[in-house]
Amino acid sequence: RLMEDKPYYRAALAAQTLHYVPPERRNFFYHVTALDPWPLYSHDIHWMELARIKHEPNSDPIRRTAPLFNIFQSRSEGFATALEELAMHEGLYDDVPRGRELVWIMLANRAARGLASLHVQANEWTLAEAGRFHARWTPRGYSDPDNPLVGFEQLLYLRQPGYGTSYVTGKAELDALIADAAAADEARPAADVLADVFAMLNREGSVPFALYPRRAR
């Protein structure tokens, strides 16, 4: 078990229940969830974290309240993106092995749209050019450059530089944090190390990964 079960976790996730969307109305995420909703449900750790802030606020008076600026991009999106893969490695798709393909497709989409966003921020590409790159490098044709979601995402990332790449860079930061913890105590079972890292994330609150305690470098 990656983390302790809480009743409010279940309620938060249940509120995000997805519905079937016909093929002609699907954007990237609906193509994925039509086959298996679990990759996106894993990403919905966001809602569980928000519920924890409400039901179990951090003991630190500074970390308990909303900051005056957005520092949560890599921490929140990186954690949610990493959890998609961590849940897979913990056995979520053992009975549906092709579900693993969707986890990798989700990551490929984040990488494509994040890289495209950097070119827009550098004034090298237009939003339309970014959308075409974004769609071209998303597997299976699941992303359409003319779909409103693609335009919305690229405009969002232009307005918030660093956000588009934070899914992948934040995941890499969490992967490194887990690797450091495992290297510091190689005799411990990997599942125990991972559970300790998750407990530390919950205890310390939503702050940039660089501010979390590191057991090894």
Model-derived regions, located:
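Long, His/Glu/Asp-enriched segments that create or flank divalent metal/ion-associated functional microenvironments
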Residues: R1-R217
